């Protein structure tokens, strides 16, 4: 959906969040015009998914014991045809990759948002990883395409250059905002924003809009402040102030089609 539609419809985003950044994530959804729900109580899943437009699962502080309840949550979303966004933090680590694979085997996710190392795992490619950040070399566009084809999900790879692919069509946003990597909450918030934009229809274009919104907000914020603490708050302000016309102009100018 476009930003004006998002503002008019106020999509409700159910976040199965980590324990580190839930307030920042909730604020980000709120300032763009959505409505956040932050919940983990299994008994509430059916009722909350029934009124939600998107479900976002973040595995950043996931415990193995939570696998079954996460699968149940996504299965409920699948039954109601509610978009599911997966943020598979550090999935390349074996203790995390095994439960994520079990999750994918038993439920369906529509969009996967991660850094290059995380997305490479879904593509079956060895890509150097260090914590939540990714380092290494390789054709990130091809990695995203392969991951999309293997999972059947839209891939939203965030980094110095963002890559969005459904396996057939791939878009690249080559705008680097280093300060975005200095705040762990911006990636988590991005996943939730992706959920909000895809609440009415799952599409590559809606995912591109979400990625571009965070990148443009970060870029504008970096022109206002230069330190991480102030930057995080400024990003929220820029998300709030961003107009549809500025967002669409930014997309038209900066987003490239990968051939």
From Swiss-Prot:
CDD domains assigned to the protein according to its UniProt record, in alphabetical order: THZ_kinase
Entry cofactors: Mg(2+)
Recorded GO MF terms: ATP binding; hydroxyethylthiazole kinase activity; magnesium ion binding
Residues holding substrate: 38, 185
Annotated GO biological process: thiamine biosynthetic process; thiamine diphosphate biosynthetic process
Database matches in InterPro entries: Hyethyz_kinase, Ribokinase-like
Superkingdom as given in the UniProt entry: Bacteria
Pathway: Cofactor biosynthesis; thiamine diphosphate biosynthesis; 4-methyl-5-(2-phosphoethyl)-thiazole from 5-(2-hydroxyethyl)-4-methylthiazole: step 1/1
Keywords: ATP-binding, Kinase, Magnesium, Metal-binding, Nucleotide-binding, Thiamine biosynthesis, Transferase
Reaction equation(s) it catalyzes: 5-(2-hydroxyethyl)-4-methylthiazole + ATP = 4-methyl-5-(2-phosphooxyethyl)-thiazole + ADP + H(+)
One Pfam family here: HK
EC number(s) reported in the record: 2.7.1.50
Binding annotation for ATP: 113, 158
Purpose of the protein: Catalyzes the phosphorylation of the hydroxyl group of 4-methyl-5-beta-hydroxyethylthiazole (THZ).
UniProt similarity note: Belongs to the Thz kinase family.
Protein name as annotated: Hydroxyethylthiazole kinase
Species for this entry: Leuconostoc citreum (strain KM20)
Gene this protein is translated from: thiM
């Amino acid at each position: 959906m476009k930003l004006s539609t998002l503002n008019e419809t106020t999509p409700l985003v159910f976040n199965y969040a980590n324990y580190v950044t839930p307030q920042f994530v909730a604020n980000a959804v709120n300032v763009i015009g959505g409505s956040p729900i932050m919940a983990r109580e299994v008994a509430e899943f059916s009722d909350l998914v029934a009124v939600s437009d998107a479900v976002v699962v973040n595995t950043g502080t996931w415990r193995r014991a939570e696998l079954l309840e996460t699968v149940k949550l996504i299965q409920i979303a699948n039954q109601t045809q509610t978009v599911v966004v997966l943020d598979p933090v550090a999935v390349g680590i074996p203790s995390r990759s095994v439960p994520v694979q079990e999750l994918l085997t038993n439920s369906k996710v529509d969009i996967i948002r991660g850094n290059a190392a995380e997305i490479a795992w879904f593509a079956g490619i060895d890509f150097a990883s260090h914590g939540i950040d990714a380092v290494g070399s390789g054709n990130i566009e091809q990695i995203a395409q392969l991951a999309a084809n293997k999972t059947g999900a839209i891939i939203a790879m965030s980094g110095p250059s963002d890559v969005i692919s459904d396996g057939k069509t791939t878009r690249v946003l080559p705008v680097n905002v280093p300060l975005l990597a200095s705040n762990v909450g911006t990636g988590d918030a991005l996943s939730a924003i992706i959920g909000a934009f895809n609440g009415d229809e799952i599409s590559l274009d809606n995912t591109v809009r979400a990625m571009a919104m965070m990148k443009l907000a970060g870029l504008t914020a970096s022109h206002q402040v230069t330190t991480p603490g102030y930057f995080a708050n400024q990003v929220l302000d820029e998300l709030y102030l961003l107009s549809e016309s500025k967002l669409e102009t930014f997309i038209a100018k900066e987003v490239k089609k990968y051939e």
